[in-house]
């Protein structure tokens, strides 16, 4: 991971941080350990997901699938009272601005409590104006459909 020159430099330096001490990490690595207990369950989940991705065609297929999922979601919300913030669209997430004095954070709460659907709330000054919808992971077009149907019900109940 590091060349010999980098390792020599690391060994001659003193870490100013308890959590980012490369020298300590290298010593632990020599004995096959990590400096702190890793998040084992997350590593297991990541390993499982990577195996699924490889079994279904690899990274290119997964990237294309995510792009299609993002496009599908964006198409489905066109007739809702929202605006897609498109200054820099990413396939991984869609930022959605609510219109007509609707409250984005309230939408987040209703989706979670009444529908069991999680979206990403925004914070700060934009808390009540913007929410984000992720497209990464083991999501499907059916998940998009379910989310958009729930959003339609929420907006209809507001009127």
Predicted regions and their residues:
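Short beta-strand-to-loop capping motifs
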Residues: 2, 96-100, 135
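Flexible, glycine/charged-enriched surface loops at secondary-structure junctions
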Residues: 56-65, 79-87, 122-124, 159
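PLP-dependent enzyme catalytic core of the Aspartate aminotransferase-like
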Residues: 125, 129-159
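Conserved PLP-binding catalytic core of the aspartate aminotransferase-like
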Residues: 82-114
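Small/polar glycine-rich anion-binding or flexible loop at a beta-alpha turn
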Residues: 70, 88-94, 124-132
